[in-house]
Amino acid sequence: MSKVFKFGGASIKNAKAITNLKNIVFSYKESLIIIVSAIDKTTNELEGVWRSFIKKDSNDAIKKANESIKFHKSIIEELGLNSDYEFFSFFKKLTQELLLFLSAGPKENDDLSYSKIVSFGELFSTLIISTYLKKEGLKNEWIDARTLIKTSNQFLESKVNWEATNNEINRTIDQNITYVSQGFIGANQMGETTTLGREGSDFTAAIFAWCLGSNEVIIWKDVDGLLNADPKYFNNTKVLKSISYKEAIELSYLGASVIHQNTIKPLENKNIPLSIRSFINTNNSGSSVREIVESKEKITSLIYKPNQVLLSISTRDYSFIFEEHISEIFSIFSKIGLKVHLMQNSALSFSVCGIISNKSLLILVAELQKNYIVKYNDKVNLLTIRNFKNLDIPKSLKDQEILIQQRSRATIRYVLK
């Protein structure tokens, strides 16, 4: 049973980083499934290409795409892959496919265009890494994840068709061979490119592991493991050496950014351990997520999500908020794209804290105001304290006003402004 490795964009940000990836892979003597994200910041750059494209500015979209292609070519040259004719022909074919798509102008479905354009980040990175590993002596096969990961027809945050995906992966993958494939992307029944959501490469690794019955998934990160808080916002962070699947699901649901929230469930279903390791400090054992008996003495975790929006919604006639109101409200959230992170309701109002783009927020408020009174605060911050020992807000956030406070047995949450 193979191990599944996942390398994120920061771990392959330049030629030196890709050489480090090679050293990690070479230290394992077994066959591997290697899932790779787009090279650092490439997804953001290709999102810029997409924004120009849907504004019908094909010239700017092509200009930005060529800048990204030029960057990838510089890495190719530094890794010494220029003389590999087969590789360069394939890479050129991919770049031409992207540029031709952009030249043809916007399609009717912007989400389809997004998935198509952004997917080239993963296609470029995996082709480079697969070829480089071959050059250095590791036999492997590059495989297009879109031929294996079968999804629903929605192009963004597409749902996995587990039966079809399981059939394709087990029909195609020989567990005696090392493969390099893409995170984040799949395809629908029509063969159109779909995406699993930002940071979805972790989920891709879990999909492969579930289908193959792998003995471990290792996610290689730029931190020493799963931390109890984001060091960007909090001092004296600690590595959670070993936690249960249940606790990992709770943390990812509450917003912990190290693990994609869909990753844990398929691993738990087949009792496949997950390790979060540092690609910098490779001797560090990192964090382990597995089926364990949880200790009564738990480490407090702090999850801070900035730039949220707080919406308070009430009926126009001051009638109670009932289930049918909430059902209608959530239907609007789903249609316009609000990701809800916290909910609270009283007799006359329903409040949610979540994340949405500024443009979509205005559309959302206008839609809700057709039937409801709506008040909102933008740029609020959501703090979640898991396994809290007291009710104190960390000193670094003391100057913020508390708009909402929620408390359960193990978790306390604040919406702050």
Model-derived features with residue positions:
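A conserved active-site cap/scaffold subdomain adjacent to cofactor or substrate pockets
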Residues: 242-290, 295-297
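A conserved regulatory-domain signal marking ACT and ACT-like small-molecule sensing domains
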Residues: 285-417
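Short, glycine-/Ser/Thr-/acidic-enriched flexible segments
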Residues: 9-10, 39-40, 185-186, 201, ...
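Conserved dinucleotide-binding and phosphotransfer motif residues
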Residues: 136, 270, 336
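Nucleotide/pyrophosphate-binding catalytic subdomain
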Residues: 1-256, 264
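Structural motif
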Residues: 2-3, 31-34, 73, 140-141, ...
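Conserved NTP-handling cores and scaffolds of large molecular machines
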Residues: 53, 255, 271, 372-375
